[in-house]
Swiss-Prot record:
This is Protein DETOXIFICATION 48. Pfam families: MatE. One of its GO terms (cellular component) is Golgi apparatus. Plants overexpressing DTX48 in initiating leaves are short, produce leaves much faster than wild-type plants and show enhanced growth of axillary buds. Overexpression of DTX48 alters shoot developmental programs leading to a loss of apical dominance phenotype. The gene is DTX48.
C-alpha cells in the first residue's frame, strides 16, 4: 500500500491499484468503446459488499480526517466551557445574561454562518478529487464574501438585542448584560466568516492536523486571555466576549499563516477579480439548504428550553435541560467529526470518478456511526446517577437528569447514523434532501410528540425527550432509505458537471439529477412529497 501525504494533490490513503485506476480515468476517452467497458466493470463494484481489507482501509482513511477533527471539536468545546466558568465567576446575573446572549447568538448568527459555510464543502471536496484546484480557491473567495455580507445584517440584530429581549418579556437586568456581551462579540461574526471557510478549505484537501494544532494553541491562550481581561482588568462580561473574539483571531492568524508559509494555496490560488462576484448559483444552491438543515436542528434545542419553561417547576426543568444539552453537545463531537470525514471522503471519490469507492465509504461510515451510537447509549445509561453531580447538587435537578439520560442515550443511537447520513448527502451535493428530512423529522414528527407526551399525557420533562427520540428515529430511518437507494453512478456524473466549472465562467445551477437519471433518482422526489 502506498499512501499519499494529506497535503498532496491526490486523495489520501489510495493504494497503488487506485492510482492506476485514476490514471486510466484521466487518459480515457469517453467516445472510446473501452471506456464503456470500464464503466460496466465499475458497475459490478456498485453492487457488492466491501471486503474486510477494503473496510479496514476505509476506516483508516476516514479516521485520518475524523480523528483530528474530533480533537479539534473537543478543544472548541473546552473553550466554550472555559468561557462559561469565567461567566460563573462573575456572578449569577452575568452567567444568566451571558448564557442568554450565547443562545441568542446561536439562533441568529452562529448557526447561519456555520450552515452557509458548509455549502462550499461538496464543491471543494469534489473539485479536489477531480484535480480542479483553481475551483477550490474560487469557491473559498465566494464563500468568504457570502458570509461577510450575511454578517452585516446579523450584526444589526445583535445591536438591538436588548430591545428584542425586553419585547419577548425577558428580565431587564439580564437583557442589559446580554446586550453588553453581544456588543463586544460582533467582531466574532466576521472572524468566523473567515475561519469556517478556511477549515473546510483545508479539510477537503485532507489537511486536518494543522487545524488541530492551531486550535490547541488558541485554546491554551484562551485561559490567560480570560484571566487578564476578566480578573486583572475587571472588564466583566465584556472581557469574556473579547477573549472569545481574540481566541478566534489567533486561530485565523495561525491557519492563514500555515496556508501561506507552506504554500498550500499555490495550486488553488486565483487572483481576486470580478469572477469572485460571478457564478454564485452552484454555491447558493448548496449553501442555502445546508444552512436551513443546520438551523432547523440547532433551533430545536432552543425550542426545547422554551417548552421546559412551561412545565411545573421550570427552574429545575430548565436547569436539567441545560445540563443535558451540554452533554449532547459533548457527545455530538464524535458523530459530527465522522460526518465531516465521510463527507470529505465521498466528495473526493465522486470528484475523482470513483463511485464504487464512495459507496464503500458510505457503508463503512454507517457501521462506524452505529457503533458510536451504541457506545453513547451505554455511556448515558451507566452514568445516569452520577453525571448531573458534575454540574449541581440540587436533588430535584439530579433526579430529572437521571430519568432523562437513558432516553438521551436512545436519541444518540439514532442521532449518530442520521448525522453521518447528512455528511454523505453533503458529499454528494444533495443538501436539499437533508434539509427536507430534518424539517419533517424534527418539526412535523418530533415537536408534536414532545408536546403530546410532555403536556397532554402529563409525562413532563421526560416527555419532551420522547419527542426528540421520535425525531431522531424518523430522521435516521428516512436518511437510511435515501442512502440505500442512491445511484452512485448518477452522483459521479453530477460531480463531474459541478467540477467542470472553470474560473471566468459562470457555472450552471446545480441540478438535482442529470437528465439520464430521472428514472433512477426518485428518492429525492419521494422525500419531498412526504416531507414538504
Amino acid at each position: 500500500m502506498c499512501n499519499s501525504k494529506p497535503s498532496s494533490a491526490s486523495s489520501s490513503l489510495l493504494s497503488c491499484k487506485d492510482k492506476t485506476h485514476i490514471s486510466k480515468l484521466e487518459t480515457c476517452d469517453t467516445d472510446n468503446p473501452h471506456y464503456s467497458e470500464f464503466r460496466d466493470t465499475d458497475s459490478l463494484d456498485l453492487k457488492r459488499w466491501p471486503s474486510f481489507l477494503e473496510g479496514l482501509e476505509e476506516v483508516k482513511a476516514i479516521g485520518k480526517i475524523s480523528g483530528p477533527t474530533a480533537m479539534t471539536g473537543l478543544l472548541m468545546y473546552s473553550r466554550a466551557m472555559i468561557s462559561m466558568l469565567f461567566l460563573g465567576y462573575l456572578g449569577e446575573l452575568e452567567l444568566a445574561g451571558g448564557s442568554l446572549s450565547i443562545g441568542f447568538a446561536n439562533i441568529t448568527g452562529y448557526s447561519v454562518i456555520s450552515g452557509l459555510s458548509m455549502g462550499m464543502e461538496p464543491i471543494c471536496g469534489q473539485a479536489y478529487g477531480a484535480k480542479q484546484m483553481k475551483l477550490l480557491g474560487l469557491t473559498l473567495q465566494r464563500t468568504v464574501l457570502l458570509l461577510l455580507s450575511c454578517s452585516v445584517p446579523i450584526s444589526f440584530s445583535w445591536l438591538n438585542m436588548r430591545r428584542i429581549l425586553l419585547w419577548c418579556g425577558q428580565d431587564e437586568e439580564i437583557s442589559s448584560v446580554a446586550q453588553q456581551f453581544l456588543l463586544f462579540a460582533i467582531p466574532d461574526l466576521f472572524l468566523l466568516s473567515l475561519l469556517h471557510p478556511l477549515r473546510i478549505y483545508l479539510r477537503t484537501q485532507n489537511i486536518t492536523l494543522p487545524v488541530t494544532y492551531s486550535t490547541a494553541v488558541s485554546v491554551l491562550l484562551h485561559v490567560p486571555l480570560n484571566y487578564l481581561l476578566v480578573v486583572k482588568l475587571e472588564m466583566g462580561v465584556a472581557g469574556v466576549a473579547i477573549a472569545m473574539v481574540l481566541t478566534n483571531l489567533n486561530l485565523v492568524v495561525l491557519l492563514s499563516s500555515f496556508v501561506y508559509f507552506t504554500s498550500v494555496h499555490s495550486d488553488t490560488w486565483v487572483p481576486i477579480t470580478i469572477d469572485s462576484l460571478k457564478g454564485w448559483s452552484a454555491l447558493l444552491s448548496l449553501a442555502i439548504p445546508t444552512c436551513v438543515s443546520v438551523c432547523l436542528e440547532w433551533w430545536w434545542y432552543e425550542f426545547m428550553i422554551i417548552l421546559c419553561g412551561l412545565l411545573a417547576n421550570p427552574r429545575a426543568t430548565v436547569a436539567s435541560m441545560g445540563i443535558l444539552i451540554q452533554t449532547t453537545a459533548l457527545v455530538y463531537v464524535f458523530p459530527s467529526s465522522l460526518s465531516l470525514g465521510v463527507s470529505t471522503r465521498i466528495s473526493n471519490e465522486l470528484g475523482a470518478k470513483r463511485p464504487a469507492k464512495a459507496r464503500v465509504s458510505m457503508i463503512i461510515s454507517l457501521f462506524c456511526a452505529i457503533a458510536l451510537g451504541l457506545m453513547a447509549m451505554v455511556f448515558a445509561v451507566l452514568v445516569r446517577h452520577h453525571w448531573g453531580r458534575l454540574f449541581t447538587t440540587d436533588a430535584e435537578i439530579l433526579q430529572l437528569t437521571s430519568i432523562a439520560l437513558p432516553i438521551v442515550g436512545l436519541c444518540e443511537l439514532g442521532n449518530c447514523p442520521q448525522t453521518t447520513g447528512c455528511g454523505v448527502l453533503r458529499g454528494c451535493a444533495r443538501p436539499t434532501l437533508g434539509a427536507n428530512i430534518n424539517l419533517g423529522s424534527f418539526y412535523f414528527v418530533g415537536m408534536p410528540v414532545a408536546i403530546l407526551f410532555g403536556f397532554v399525557f402529563k409525562q413532563g420533562f421526560p416527555g419532551l425527550w420522547f419527542g426528540l427520540l421520535a425525531a431522531q428515529a424518523t430522521c435516521a430511518s428516512l436518511m437510511l432509505c435515501a442512502l440505500l437507494r442512491t445511484d452512485w453512478k448518477v452522483q459521479a456524473e453530477r460531480a463531474e458537471e459541478l467540477t467542470s466549472q472553470t474560473p471566468g465562467k459562470s457555472p450552471p445551477l446545480l441540478p438535482i439529477a442529470s437528465s439520464k437519471s430521472r428514472s433512477t433518482s426518485g428518492t429525492e422526489d419521494m422525500m419531498r412529497t412526504m416531507l414538504v
